[in-house]
Design a protein with these regions (language model features):
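Positively charged n-region of N-terminal signal peptides that target proteins for export
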Residues: 1-4, 20
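Sec-dependent N-terminal signal peptides
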Residues: 4-13
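Sec/Tat signal peptide C-region and signal peptidase I cleavage site
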Residues: 15-19
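Trp- and acidic/polar-enriched beta-sheet ligand-binding modules for extracellular glycan
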Residues: 20-40, 45-46, 104-107, 130-215
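Disordered, acidic Ser/Thr/Pro-rich linker "stalks" and the adjacent N-terminal cap
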Residues: 20-113, 213-215
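First exposed extracellular module after export/assembly in secreted or surface-exposed proteins
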Residues: 22, 86, 115, 122-126, ...
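Extended extracellular/luminal ectodomain segments enriched in beta-structured repeat modules
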Residues: 105-107, 116-125, 183
Length: 215
């Protein structure tokens, strides 16, 4: 009887968690320039994405830190490039995470590990697809929906536009900002994609964060 009661409680908890999953559209969208051949200094001056990635201004990362980023799979490296999960959080828009599963990567994911003392996260920022230039962006698949898990519990589905842009999502306040707290995680699972014109590989150039507790 106790086993049945426990099983019913687990099922009820899972159903409650699923019911709390919210669908989120981007709150802000910043367009990538078509011409990326300009010097980095000029790009930083002219475009908010480059200023955000390379400008060096104070941000959540003044105190925020990620322990590690792991991917469920990654495309095999070529002679010039690799496609590991950590590339999605290296603040380099030309390096990417490309999943390595058969097909278009539905169900593949990234997991970010945060120390308990890390400032809390409120915003997820995504450079969707291979944004290096318009040609490779179209050729490779892009994410249409990402499911977000906080400590393995699903909390949100991010609805990404099919555009070569930086898309920002307000996800609520996540984390502890407590030196006595344990490590916590955010997982991002590919639920749906926009197919590429040439390759099935689904690509994320950058996935990083903004938040509170740093000023």
């Amino acid at each position: 009887m106790k086993k049945i009661t426990l099983m019913l409680a687990i099922i009820a908890t899972a159903l409650m968690a699923q019911g709390q999953v919210k669908q989120i559209k981007p709150s802000h969208i910043y367009k990538m320039p078509a011409n990326t051949s300009k010097s980095l200094e000029v790009l930083i001056e002219e475009n908010s994405i480059y200023e955000d990635l390379y400008g060096g201004q104070c941000s959540w990362y003044c105190g925020g830190v990620i322990d590690t980023v792991l991917a469920s799979s990654s495309l095999a490296p070529s002679k010039k490039f690799d496609y590991k999960g950590a590339n999605a959080h290296d603040f380099d828009h030309e390096s990417v995470w490309a999943e390595g599963a058969p097909g278009q990567g539905i169900g593949e994911y990234l997991v970010y590990y945060f120390p308990g003392s890390c400032p809390r996260v409120t915003t997820v920022k995504v450079l969707n697809g291979h944004v290096k230039n318009p040609k490779v962006w179209k050729e490779n698949s892009r994410v249409k929906q990402l499911k977000v898990y906080y400590n393995d519990v699903p909390i949100a589905i991010l609805d990404l536009q099919d555009s070569r842009t930086l898309q920002c999502f307000e996800v609520g306040t996540l984390g502890y900002h407590d030196s006595n707290a344990s490590q916590w995680t955010l997982k991002f699972e590919i639920m749906d994609v926009y197919p590429g014109t040439k390759y099935q590989d689904t690509v994320i150039s950058e996935l990083y964060f903004d938040g509170i507790d740093v000023h």
